[in-house]
Structures are given as C-alpha cells and as structure tokens.
Amino acid sequence: MQLSRWFFSTNHKDIGTLYLIFGAWAGMAGTAMSVIIRTELAQPGSLLQDDQIYNVIVTAHALVMIFFMVMPIMIGGFGNWLIPLMIGAPDMAFPRMNNMSFWLIPPSFLLLLASAGVESGAGTGWTIYPPLSSGLAHAGGSVDLAIFSLHLAGASSILASINFITTVINMRTPGISFDRLPLFVWSVFVTAFLLLLSLPVLAGAITMLLTDRNVNTTFFDPAGGGDPILFQHLFWFFGHPEVYILILPGFGMISHVIAHYAGKSEPFGYLGMVYAIVSIGILGFLVWAHHMFTVGMDVDTRAYFTAATMIIAVPTGIKVFSWMATLQGSNLRWDTPLLWALGFVFLFTIGGLTGVILANSSIDVILHDTYYVVAHFHYVLSMGAVFAIFAGFTHWFPLFSGVGLHPLWGNIHFTLMFIGVNLTFFPQHFLGLAGMPRRYSDYPDAYTLWNTVSSIGSTISLIATLVFLFILWEAFTSQRTALQPEFSTSSLEWQYSSFPPSHHTFDEIPSTVYLIK
C-alpha cells in the first residue's frame, strides 16, 4: 500500500510532498558543495589541489541548487500542494503526468552526480560554454552525463508546465475568474509559460553540444564554420528566463505571506501586481545578451540590452512598493513567516540595485566575471528565492502537515540565516570591486580578509541549516495541533475542514462567493 501510494501516486498533495522532501535533500547536497567552495576560499593557498575539482564542485553546486532545490520546492512542492487548493480544483489536470514529472527528477540528479564522479568531472561552470565543454577540453563522459541530466530535468519541467497551465485555465471553481486568481497561482502560471518557451531552446543548444562532442558536427567550432557565441545566445535565451522562473513563484508566496500577517484580505494593488508578474515574464525574454556584454557586441546592441534590462526594474519596483504599501497601516503579527518575508523584501531590493548597476554595459565590462556578479545573483537567489521558500514553508507547514512549528526556534533559525547569508555575500561586493575574478580556487593575499569573513558567514548558514532540520524534528515529535489561522478568509487553501486537507479534497466542487466590500 505505502509503496503504491508513494511510487505510483496520482495525488497532488502526495506528489507535492515528494517534491518538498526531494528538494530538501538536494538542498543539503548543494549546501555541502557550497561549504566546500567556501572552505577552499577561506584562506589563500590550495586545499583541493586542483582547479578542475574546484570547478566541478562549483558547477554541481549551481546545477543542484537551481534544478534540484529551488525549482522542485517552489514549483513542484508549493505549486502542486497549493494551486489545486487555491483554485478549488479536485487535483491537477493530468495526475499521472504529474507523477512522471516528479520521477524524472531523481534519475536526472543521479546523472548529474555521475557526471561529477566519472573521469575528471564537468568543470565547465553551470553555463557549459564551449570550447571548454568541447570534446577536446573536456574529454570523457562527464559533460555528456551533465547534458543528459539537463535533458531529463528539462523534460520534467516542460511536462509540469503543461500540467499547471491546463489546470489553471480549465479547473478553476466557479467564482474564481482570472482577475481573482490568487497571486501565487498567477506567478506559477506565468512561470510555467516561461519554462515552456525557454527550455526547448536549452535542449536544442545542449543537443548541438552533444553532437559536437560525439559525432563531429561543428555547430560551435569555428574550424567547421560554427561559432561558440551561438551557444551563448542559445544558452542565455534560456538562462535569463530561468532566473525569473526561480524568483517569480517566490514573489507569489511573499505576496500571500505579507498580506496574511498584515491582516489584509489581499495585497495592495492586486491588479498591478498581476500586470507586474506578466510584464516581468515577457521582458525576461528580451534581455538575455546582458550576460554577454564582454563578447564583442555592437555598441547599439549593448545600448538596447542595457535599456531593456533596466526596464525590468520597473515592474519589480511596483511589486516591492506594493508589498510595502500592504504593510502600511496594519497591525502586524510578528510570526516567523513575516520575518522571512520582510527579510526577502529588504535583501531582494539590495540584489536588485546591484542588478541595475550591472545592467550598464560599460560598467559590466569591468565587473563581468568578478565576485560582484556572484554577490548580485546570490542576493537575489540565496536571500531571495531561499527566503521566499522559508517564508512559504513556515507559513503553510501547518496546512501541509497538521502540526505547528516552534515559534522561538523558527525565529532563531531566521536570525542565524540572516546573519550568515549577509556575512557570506556582502563582502563579495568588495572583492568584485577590487577585481577578484570568479571560478578560481586561489587568490592573491590582498583578498584574504573579505574571503575569510565570507567563509565564516557560510559556516553560520550551515549551522542555520542544521537548526532547520532540528525544527522539523521538533515539530513532528511534539505534535502541536495546527489551528486555523486568524485572517484566513481571503485564501481558499485554509477553508478546508482539516489540516492537512483529506487525501481527496472534495466530495463535490466548491463554489466561491466574493463579498463586495
């Protein structure tokens, strides 16, 4: 019974739980890799003896965190659990395809670990640029295994996207029109379109790389009339929407959490928030070459990508100010999820500001491939996506599990994590401005101080992760009954009779009525 329940599940709650558990495990693997990176960089001199090994760990860290931690948790975990509940659907549109979406992920993860384990590993960076990833510079099977891993993860995401799009369009209960869709549902809906449009481009790029490596095509080899810059265009046409895929569901979760703990029935400027989500989704496809300001583009091309990149700051700013306005005039309940959400807004804004700086192509030429860029994207990921995940997790955990988290330990976890990530990544701005390049395992002595500070910060984050595991253990062993939250009338997912809602949510389809205030 248990075997068939978890292996052959067609239930959105069980599949969501599988995604959450898998994402937590992958997150621990990715965190372990990041600690290895920071240990190597804690002092000058070599620890791992070899830049190839170092770059293999950097590559695996990035791919694990993106494809096996953030996306499975945000889209697979929260998306599966909450979207059917929020729109009053009995389940997802294609329950068996939903199951396949999940079970493509563990084999993909194993292939990625295999790529690091065979030969000398794939030390290409997560971007897998040729000619470094070519058959010449990376002989052996490592890069091929990484390519197959990405194919499986991509197939999984495409299937999941089809499922979410169909579910949201066709399975809303009467009364939930598109202009009343909860913001988290909107964000995953837009994210699904981004995945559906960008992943096939990545699949094409890495398939061409695969044939370049194995069957003597020359898509990316100038000797046969190819161009390595083509790969960069194809990769970043996927890669830039991908970073919005990683953050948009987080935006949706933060909107729910802030409105909830501010005691508001909805976030400030709901319709503007929806348009902002959609605008970010569209603009995300029009700015990819800002990752390539140093490859020798025309000045007018650079001018366009600079301007277009800055325009993305407008809908993002609308969202940040709407979150601030939601807090205005409210009697806040200072529960752990609100702390994570406020931390998100503050730190994501800092990450966004460094993004506006990097959008200037003239400045980016200097800062490209320095730790300034590392600091920028870790502020929006390590403190954006991850804080959003913890905000959502601490907020909805009683709904998922039926038990309550310990409030004091939750606040301790937040405090440790907040100190840890800021201590890790803020000094990296200084390193970048001082010219320290990325993807090297060693550095001149002049950079020692801030690298040591950064590595101390990563140790604090590691301790915070262990505290989180303790919090989970404590919650399940103490079995505190989860109560219906006070201000829950605005969100359909809290309206069901028990926590967690029964295996099959409904006996019959609900109908929602909105009171005109």
UniProtKB/Swiss-Prot annotation:
Keyword Mitochondrion tagged: yes
Residues that bind heme a3: 376
Membrane topology note: Multi-pass membrane protein
Enzyme Commission code(s) on record: 7.1.1.9
Residues that bind O2: 244
Binding site for Cu cation: 240, 290-291
Cofactor binding annotation: Binds 2 heme A groups non-covalently per subunit.
Keyword DNA repair belongs to the record: no
PROSITE patterns: COX1, COX1_CUB
Similarity comment: Belongs to the heme-copper respiratory oxidase family.
Protein name (record): Cytochrome c oxidase subunit 1
Species name: Patiria pectinifera
Species lineage: Eukaryota, Metazoa, Echinodermata, Eleutherozoa, Asterozoa
